[in-house]
Amino acid sequence: MMVFAFWKVFLILNCLAGQVNMVQVTIPDTFVNVTVGSNVTLLCLYTTTVTSLEKLSIQWSFFHNKEMEPISIYYSEGGQASAIGQFKDRIIGATNPGNASITILHMQPADSGIYICDVNNPPDFFGKNQGILDVTVLVKPSKPFCSIQGRPEAGHPISLSCLSAFGTPSPVYYWYKIEGNTIVPVKESFNSATGVLDIGNLTNFEKGYYQCTAINSLGNSSCEIDLTSSDPEVGIIIGALVGALTGAAIIICVVYFARNKVKSKQKNLNSSTELEPMTKVHHSRQNEAIPAGGIQLEGTLPSSIHASHNTEPTTAVLEPEYEPNPPLETATQPDPEPEGSGPMPVPETEIQLQPEMELEPETEPEPEPEPEPQPELESELEPDPQSGVIVEPMREEEKETVKA
């Protein structure tokens, strides 16, 4: 208290002596409202006891309502001025003495907040050198968004909501019902600050079109919503339609995959069929010397032997080692004749030969005395390993003749 009293006395004495230097800042309008997109001039006037303005400095600071620390947006000293931050190229400062006002161009909602004007002119260190302004950017309500809470079916409780994303000052909401060409206020209670309309259990009386209007000092905006109680039969029809479409889609998919599978199998079958003729040709060339039905070779004994024995030409039958399919009937061997009756003529057997294959004639052997006939003994000729055939048994007399 003693210090404060001392300074008070000191200032009074200096004023009486005419030696006190002071700066006085005046703010004509501390509350300013401006429409979004328009320009605004923030007035700040000052007085100083120092005649020289060479050291005069003017600074404007701003902080948004949500921020705690002010930021410098404009500074001028010795006639040199500059704008800073989000207001760069948007601020024009006054140049006439005693006027520290600024004009801000194209105001936006984010420009709403507190502005501080600070003036200093050394050696003026006393007085009120600071002024504060509260600026609000007015915004027309944006088009509200209307929505339904609950199931819009008869007997179910529902409510309607309406909300604008932007609007300064905060808009007030009103609900109306559209009946034909007229709009009438709703009878149900609603909250004008939040825009919620509580309808309760929906009946046929409440169904129809509703309109919500958001209003503030700059204008209004509206939205509409169609509130119609749905018929249960409509839900059944929609469900049946969805089920039918789903079933049809499943059937189409099954048919599509089945057809693709059949086409794939047919393609593989065609590929194997194209390779089959080459395989058959290869087998037929290997079997040209050995027909599938069996091979029979015809060999004729020399004519001198036939003449000496007075016999018919003898035929030797060769058959394959394996049993052909279908089996071929072999020539039936005749019953042996009793001794002394002479050699039995061998019946001629037809032998199938390919035209290209012929037996080379053997060298004619010298005739030998005719042996006495003996009982027939069955024997097998050794198969030719190269031809893969079996020689049919011959009579003993024929063997002796061939060996000779």
UniProtKB/Swiss-Prot annotation:
Ig-like C2-type domain ranges (all copies): 141-228
Domain of life: Eukaryota
GO cellular component, one term: plasma membrane
Record's compositionally biased regions (Basic and acidic residues): 393-404
Positions of disulphide bridges: 44-117, 162-212
Acidic residues bias (residue ranges): 357-383
Domain Ig-like V-type: 23-133
Record keywords, A-Z: Disulfide bond, Glycoprotein, Immunoglobulin domain, Membrane, Phosphoprotein, Repeat, Signal, Transmembrane, Transmembrane helix
Topology term for the membrane: Single-pass type I membrane protein
Name recorded for this polypeptide: V-set and immunoglobulin domain-containing protein 1
Organism: Rattus norvegicus (Rat)
Gene: Vsig1
